[in-house]
Regions:
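Catalytic Zn2+-binding segment of zinc metalloproteases
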Residues: 165-180, 188-193
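Short alpha-helical segments that sit at the start of domains
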Residues: 307-323, 395-422
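Helix-hairpin-helix
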Residues: 147-170
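Accessory beta->alpha helical hairpin/"wing" motif in late/C-terminal subdomains of nucleic-acid enzymes
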Residues: 367-398, 471-488
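C-terminal accessory module of base-excision DNA glycosylases/AP lyases that mediates lesion recognition
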Residues: 1-55, 179-184, 192-318, 453-459, ...
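Long, highly charged, low-complexity intrinsically disordered interaction regions
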Residues: 54-151
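Short helix-coil junctions and helix-kink-helix linkers
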Residues: 346-354, 439-450
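Short amphipathic alpha-helical interaction segments
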Residues: 353-363, 448-462
């Protein structure tokens, strides 16, 4: 589908009209906990989308090509920071300079507090394909071109880091579509659907992702609000299409209003609108609604669980980490196609100790393979063998870094395996009995039940011992202390 056809749909037009009428008058209660991204927190009530931008906060730091620190926190500072990153990225990509393009991409991720895309970016750069891939994607995602959403089926990876890279390379105002922006627009759409007289299945099921803390980023947590599909449940290409769809909607909306006129031309106005959504999406309680107790999100097929709604603490899908890595290496040596479906087929067809895995169990074993964890599919055999071997070298290979940088927890629920190692190491360091450790994990809010706490620690032990972060007694090692120095889960 092309832009004009998309915007001509009655429900899309009605949603844009609803936004134009309601966004200036809605009141938002911004309540941010103190964190490294928002030092001191934020408590303010504002009316209207334009007023939200005045309270933009995202404390970040990255290093330019001369290794000088570039710091930002306010919207004005962030604009300057992103302008530098955009120029660096654009220069590298258009010159075909793979190393400059790669370094710009890595610093964009550092600014955004995300790291999942690092292995993918390194692989593209090593094969000399990074610049050409980003240029191809830029053409497919431009908001002012005659492109078709179907053409985005060629997207190889997409996550909260890559959306930032693609948005910064774009010149037409393409939004960064992360969990917070997705949550905000999904909430606005849910409110629109409550008031709209039209019928039929929801046309604009904007996806979102989970927060690192107890913030709500799925409208389905509120009574009679449509739940947002989770990033983990949709294809990479579909996530990219939602970035384009949202961009089309924002340009159409700003084209009929004077909002953010002081920001400059249309692309700058689009990014100001996106930044305001980013602030609203931190916690959807800002819309003034009270979440349903033990909320069950309302999905297209009825109720779905809290986990599917993106509220599952730091509980992973249980899996035997070391064994799955060894299985994957054997699978790669078999010569089968290197993708999830083929690996799941292989796992189901290979009995273990006389037992055959169910397909659901085999799919669960792929938890650490996603781009949100270690992005293992597509690794070279040489790198994979280092990862399977484990230890510090295996961890560096898994994280695609020549040196082991201190682990940081971003704003979203990603890197669950490594967070679980951190939680597990701390649990064993402070408590001697199983009950005390389980109580610690549950009381801290990392898991909701005793069983889920045990699943969390089982994965934490498995991953931690594999990479030498935990010893045989599951206690933190010197490598643990080095890797997690300064790490905090406070959100």
């Amino acid at each position: 589908m092309k832009r004009d056809d998309f915007l001509a749909q009655p429900e899309v037009e009605a949603f844009i009209e609803w936004l134009a009428a309601n966004l200036p008058v809605l009141t938002f209660k911004l309540r941010f906990k103190s964190s490294k991204f928002v030092p001191g927190g934020l408590t303010v009530d504002v009316q209207g989308i334009e007023q939200v931008l005045e309270h933009y906060r995202w404390k970040a730091s990255w290093r330019d090509s001369h290794q000088s620190a570039v710091d930002s926190e306010t919207w004005m500072q962030t604009q300057g920071s992103l302008r530098q990153l955009r120029e660096w990225l654009s220069a590298g990509v258009h010159a075909g300079d793979e190393q400059q393009a790669l370094q710009a991409c890595l610093q964009i991720l550092r600014w955004g507090g995300v790291r999942g895309a690092i292995p993918f970016l390194h692989r593209l750069a090593a094969s000399g394909e990074l610049s050409s891939y980003l240029k191809k994607m830029a053409g497919l995602m431009a908001l002012d071109a005659d492109n078709d959403l179907d053409d985005l089926s060629s997207v190889e990876r997409f996550d909260s880091g890559l959306t930032k890279i693609h948005a910064l390379l774009d010149l037409s105002g393409s939004p960064i579509y992360d969990s917070r922006v997705g949550a905000a627009i999904a909430m606005l759409y849910a409110l629109f659907r409550q008031q709209w007289a039209g019928r039929g299945k929801p046309l604009l099921r904007f996806p979102s992702g989970g927060a690192r803390g107890d913030q709500i980023r799925n409208p389905g947590a509120f009574a009679n609000c449509l739940a947002a599909p989770q990033f983990s449940a949709i294809e990479y290409a579909e996530w990219a299409r939602w970035q384009v769809r949202l961009g089309w909607i924002v340009r159409a909306l700003l084209g009929r209003t004077g909002w953010f006129a002081d920001q400059g031309a249309m692309p700058a106005r689009c990014h100001a609108f996106e930044a305001s959504l980013f602030m609203l999406g931190y916690d959807l309680r800002c819309f003034g609604l009270t979440p349903v107790p033990e909320a069950q999100a309302v999905g297209e097929q009825g109720e779905v669980s809290l986990r599917e709604s993106g509220n599952s603490g730091w509980v992973p899908t249980g899996h035997p980490f070391g064994q799955v890595l060894s299985d994957y290496l054997a699978f790669r040596h078999s010569g089968a196609p290197d993708n999830k479906n083929a690996f799941v087929d292989w796992l189901v067809a290979e009995p273990r100790n006389g037992k055959t895995l169910s397909r659901a169990t085999a799919q669960g074993y792929c938890f650490p393979f996603s781009i949100d964890e270690f992005d293992l599919f597509g690794r070279s055999l040489a790198v994979l063998e280092r990862i399977v071997e484990g230890g510090e070298d295996g961890l560096r290979a898994a994280l695609s870094g020549e040196t082991l940088e201190p682990f940081t927890v971003g704003d979203e629920r990603v890197s669950v395996c490594l967070v679980d190692v951190f939680i597990t190491g701390n649990a064993y360091a402070r408590a001697e009995s199983d009950k005390e450790r389980v109580d610690y994990v549950v009381n801290a809010g990392y898991a909701g039940t005793e069983n889920s706490a045990r699943t969390l620690m089982a994965v934490g032990r498995s991953v931690g011992k594999h990479f030498g972060l935990l010893d045989v007694q599951h206690l933190p090692t010197p490598l643990f202390e080095q890797f997690y120095q300064g790490c905090s889960l406070d959100a």
